[in-house]
Amino acid sequence: MNREKIETNEGMLFIWEDSEIREFWMKNTYFNLDLFFINQYGVIVEVYKNAKAFDERKIISKEKVKFVLEMKAGDIKANVGDNLICSSN
């Protein structure tokens, strides 16, 4: 992420053209994050809670996903099976 701070309810949404197994790590990340792995239908299929800042171990999705949402740890209470709805507004 390479940011020193993030505001409440801000995050990063990673979007790919295809669904694949995705890998992340926390190098250069100054705060803990929750990662939401989302399939091509917008359904959360896996949640990795409280990934530790600066941890260089890989976080690997268990299924193929098209989207990953990173949020500051604890900011949103989304669970496996919830839908993600995106708007450009």
Predicted features and spans:
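Compact, glycine-rich, soluble single-domain proteins
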Residues: 1-89
